[in-house]
């Protein structure tokens, strides 16, 4: 009698085939080596893209209402995402000095921030110092030489602005399109290559 294939094996195979087909479909839409689709084809950041759901890109016609994120930066300035609406893509990164993965991804975030500025791309970075005394957060920013601004969020309420799309814990990164809608999310530390790909894909989706 021929042994039966375990049901879980069939399910896993089906999921794998579905993931591959989805990535191939994405690849057909882009030839940009920085795009997430091209990264998937090459295998870069494969764990993020094909399997654990850490990266999500939202098509233009499926994006929800604009997010209004506002607060006080660690250097005492008032800021609102509405001031960027219609002009710039906003990259929001949730972090804390008490979070080891957050510390590890800082060089990658800094690299992308420096690169988009040098290239003159319409992109603004804004961190959220999550559940931390602002003085401690400000000292950490100085020590780590973080050049992009961050909002202070000692009470942990700013993420409520994202509604059901709110990140659950740091590190998390969200990319808002120029209309202020969440266009991409990365749950967990993100590499410079992946973040640049997400940003470029959002910029192209609105061109």
Feature locations, PLM:
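Structural microenvironment flanking redox-active thiols in thiol-disulfide oxidoreductases
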Residues: 103-144, 154-161
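N-terminal targeting signals for export/organelle localization
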Residues: 1-70, 207
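Hydrophobic beta-strand anchors of alpha/beta hydrolase catalytic cores
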Residues: 91-92, 125
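Short cysteine clusters
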Residues: 29, 99-102
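A short beta-strand-turn-helix
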Residues: 61-63, 68-90
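Thiol/disulfide oxidoreductase modules built on the thioredoxin-like
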Residues: 139-147, 153-206
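Aromatic-flanked redox-active Cys/Sec active sites in thiol-based oxidoreductases
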Residues: 93-99
């Amino acid at each position: 009698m021929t042994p039966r294939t375990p049901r879980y094996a069939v399910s896993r195979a089906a999921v794998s085939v579905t993931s591959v087909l989805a990535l191939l479909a994405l690849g057909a839409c882009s030839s940009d080596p920085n795009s997430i689709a091209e990264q998937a084809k090459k295998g870069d950041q494969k764990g993020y893209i094909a399997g654990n759901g850490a990266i999500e890109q939202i098509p233009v016609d499926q994006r929800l209402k604009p997010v209004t994120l506002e607060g006080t930066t660690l250097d005492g300035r008032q800021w609102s995402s509405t001031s960027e609406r219609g002009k710039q893509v906003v990259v929001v990164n949730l972090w804390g000095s008490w979070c080891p993965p957050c510390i590890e991804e800082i060089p990658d975030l800094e690299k992308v921030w420096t690169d988009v500025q040098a290239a003159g791309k319409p992109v603004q970075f804004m961190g959220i110092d999550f559940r931390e005394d602002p003085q401690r957060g400000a000292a950490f920013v100085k020590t780590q030489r973080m050049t992009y601004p961050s909002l202070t969020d000692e009470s942990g309420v700013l993420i409520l602005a994202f509604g059901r799309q709110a990140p659950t814990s740091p590190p998390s990164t969200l990319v808002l399109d120029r209309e202020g809608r969440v266009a991409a999310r990365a749950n967990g530390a993100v590499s410079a290559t992946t973040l640049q790909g997400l940003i470029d894909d959002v910029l192209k989706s609105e061109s």
